[in-house]
């Protein structure tokens, strides 16, 4: 630092530094070498049928990274997206072609789903009988934000009487007990009961091609139903569908 202090750049800091240097020198791409030969459609150590992805967009890689994919850190991908720096993810041990992380406009999508990610360290918290009025959700999440507790999926039920509703959200399992404690000590909100389920997992499918492909949501839900897997919560965006299930 300017004051001469020495500190660690943290996990993924070397990747982000490499991207920053590539941007400064305006190189054609930034090559990141790791212990795998690219980005896979899922964890190849757990899913034998996982396939290496030749090209993936910044947005898709950001989603997969945030959902637990460990090949690239979100900070490096975000820096590359802002600076429009193409990334080549390659193996240190082979000469095989890796994965290109590039602008979405330069990818010709032939498949709707690019990758599948999962995490086993989630918790689901539900507040029953919350007052149905403006500002309540903000009051619930304010102390969590101040205590650096990240909230992921949020689902609010439709109020049937216009007075009370239910609010469900997910956090990391390591934060759930602290979150419950903060909620119980929060005098700004009123609710009837609070439930915690800290034995849940999250499964997500990611793909920029989903927005133009009808039926992806149905296929995912049908696949889970055929395996008798019940969905506890659902969250969607243009390029991601996430569900919470029992562990």
Locate each region found by the language model.
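C-terminal catalytic "cap/lid" subdomain
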Residues: 1-247
